[in-house]
Structures are given as structure tokens and as C-alpha cells.
UniProtKB/Swiss-Prot annotation:
Pfam families: AA_kinase. CDD domains: AAK_NAGK-C. The modification N-acetylthreonine is found at T51. This is Acetylglutamate kinase, chloroplastic. It comes from Arabidopsis thaliana.
């Protein structure tokens, strides 16, 4: 969701990303390539297929004309200008991790955003994969207050799955889509230092972020790489901890002075009425969302997500959005349209 306005007539559209520019613009737009890539990196591009309710020629199922594709691309210009060169931290999880179609959508969105000059950073968890491996090893998964109880054996599996499997798979997918990703965890370059959560006696090796040192990330994003970060880190003694990925994303966004924090979730966003999906709140400030928590309108698993957003905003992040990760190309809808794809929280 952005506050940019365009003079073009409003349309309802969705993006399908493909490779490269030659299907849309005959590779004559160097400004739409990585500005910081060295000469050895190839040029990236994208085309956009629009599915709209008007004009009738599109509604009939005919392929959009080249002119119409260019029109849709030109409507993205104000949003590209607004966010070009800005850091966007995205937390990836939920249904978007288990559906191949949604996973492909997230990856292509990240590549497109990087191609037009944004600086995306991806933070991920991996609950479904962890649960599957625990089941294969006949280790029961246990949760308390939404947090995974993590003993020493479980912690070893969490690290193995998040860092060794999920992270590297995402890096490979992003690379295959045309960008260059670098896989990291909180351990690398002392990016994150963990500490145990207050109720660690009940939860085991579940941690929270004690410190962030983003110096290892800055040269990566400066040179056009997409960092992909697994949400595990160690304390000062070297003990590994499992950290909530929302928390990691929020703390990284704050440390980097990000323009935007985006949490992909399995809900439409923040609802005025939890029982009514049509009551989505498009935009709300910190004061308003705190009042919703007090009134019980924000409850359950949404509370830690909202608090994560509030904390990041209080530390200088411009906006934080909770968006519907079940929707294909929700990242593009959130950043490249006024409508957005969920709820944007402002300071």
C-alpha cells in the first residue's frame, strides 16, 4: 500500500512476472536494471500481464495488447519513483511457504522489485518444514502461547531445516528467477545476537533479539544482492536460539532504517470485525491499533504481529504492513498500488 497517486484512470489489475524486458520493452531501459550491479552481472527485466474487468476486449479472454501492457507499466512509474533505492524488509511465512504457486509469486515479486531499484530483504521461518522433519523423526511438536517449545534436539533440527534447507531453497529459487540472492542466518557476521525469552524455563531455546549489527547486510544490498535470512541466532556464549521470524524482520527493519516492513500472513489483514472478512482496515495509525488491542478487536496470533509492527515504527521504520500472503503477487499489490493488499500501520 502506498500513498502515491497517479493521473491514470483507476483499474483493478494483477501482475504476472516473466523474464525478461524483451517481451514488453525491447531492452532499452537501463534505468530499470540494477543500478549497482557490476559489469559482469546480466541485466534483469520483467513483463506484466494485466487481468482487468475493462476494457471489454480484455474481459473476453483475449491477450492484452502491447499498448495496454505499456500503459500498465507506465502507471507503475510513480510507485517505482517513490520506492527506488529504499529498503523493504519482507517476512515470508504461512501459506505462501507451502503453496508452490504462492512461493513462485513471492520470488518473482522480489526479483521484480529489485530489478526496478528497490532493496528487498527477505526474512523467513519454516514451521511446516520443521514439523515435517520432527514427524519423520518421531519427535512431537509442542507449542505454548503460539511459540514452539524448543529443547536441544529440536533446536538442532530447527537450525538444520531453516538454515540448511529452507534458506538455500529460497536462494536457489531467487537465483533461478534472475536475481542474485545470498543466504544468511543471525549467526553470520554477528547479524543478530539472541537472548532467551523471559519464560525460557517453559519454552527452552526460544529467543528474542538482543542486538542487531546490520553491517554485513549493507554491502550486499548496495551491490544489488537480495539477502535471505533464516530466523535463528546465538547468544554471546554461542548457544543457538529459535527466534520468531516476525520479530527478526521487525528488528532488522528498524536497524536498517527501512522504508517499509511487510509481514506476509494467512489473513487479509487487520479486521474491524474478526468474523467479517469484508471489514478489512486498509490503514491505521499506532494509536488506533493500540485501541483495537485494548478493545479486544485484535487478538490471538495477530497481537504479536501488530506489536512487532508498532515496535519497528517506533524505531524509525516509515510504514509497516500486514498483508494477505494467500493472494498471488500480494507484494506487488502492496507496493505498486494505492489499494494495497492488507493493512498498513503508520506512526
Amino acid at each position: 500500500m502506498a500513498t502515491v497517486t497517479s493521473n491514470a484512470s483507476p483499474k483493478s489489475f494483477s501482475f504476472t512476472v516473466s523474464n525478461p524486458f524483451k517481451t514488453l520493452i525491447p531492452n532499452k531501459s537501463p534505468s530499470l536494471c540494477y543500478p549497482t550491479r557490476n559489469k559482469n552481472h546480466h541485466r534483469l527485466g520483467f513483463s506484466i500481464k494485466a487481468t482487468v474487468s475493462t476494457p471489454p476486449s480484455i474481459a473476453t479472454g483475449n491477450a492484452p495488447s502491447p499498448d495496454y501492457r505499456v500503459e500498465i507499466l507506465s502507471e507503475s512509474l510513480p510507485f517505482i519513483q517513490k520506492f527506488r533505492g529504499k529498503t523493504i524488509v519482507v517476512k515470508y511465512g504461512g501459506a505462501a511457504m507451502t503453496s508452490p504457486e504462492l512461493k513462485s509469486s513471492v520470488v518473482s515479486d522480489l526479483v521484480l522489485l529489485a530489478c526496478v531499484g528497490l532493496r528487498p530483504i527477505l526474512v523467513h521461518g519454516g514451521g511446516p518444514d520443521i514439523n515435517r522433519y520432527l514427524k519423520q523423526l518421531n519427535i512431537p511438536a509442542e507449542f505454548r502461547d503460539g511459540l514452539r517449545v524448543t529443547d536441544a534436539t529440536t533446536m538442532e533440527i530447527v537450525s538444520m531445516v531453516l538454515v540448511g534447507k529452507v534458506n538455500k531453497n529460497l536462494v536457489s529459487l531467487i537465483n533461478a528467477a534472475g536475481a542474485t540472492a545470498v543466504g544468511l542466518s543471525g549467526h553470520d557476521g554477528r547479524l543478530l545476537t539472541a537472548r532467551p525469552v523471559p519464560n525460557s524455563a517453559q519454552l527452552g531455546f526460544v529467543g528474542e533479539v538482543a542486538r542487531v549489527d546490520p553491517s554485513v547486510l549493507r554491502p550486499l544490498v548496495d551491490y544489488g544482492y537480495i539477502p535471505v535470512i533464516a530466523s535463528v541466532a546465538a547468544d554471546d556464549s554461542g548457544q543457538a536460539y529459535n527466534i520468531n521470524a516476525d520479530t527478526v524482520a521487525g528488528e532488522l527493519a528498524a536497524a536498517l532504517g527501512a522504508e517499509k516492513l511487510i509481514l506476509l500472513t494467512d489473513v487479509a489483514g487487520i479486521l474491524e470485525n474478526k468474523e467479517d472478512p469484508s471489514s478489512l482496515i486498509k490503514e491505521i495509525d499506532i494509536k488506533g491499533v493500540k485501541k483495537m488491542i485494548e478493545d479486544g478487536k485484535v487478538a490471538g496470533g495477530m497481537i504479536p504481529k501488530v506489536k512487532c509492527c508498532i515496535r519497528s515504527l517506533a524505531q524509525g521504520v516509515k510504514t509497516a504492513s500486514i498483508i494477505d500472503g494467500r493472494r498471488q503477487h500480494s507484494l506487488l499489490h502492496e507496493i505498486m498500488s494505492d489499494e494495497g493488499a492488507g493493512t498498513m500501520i503508520t506512526g
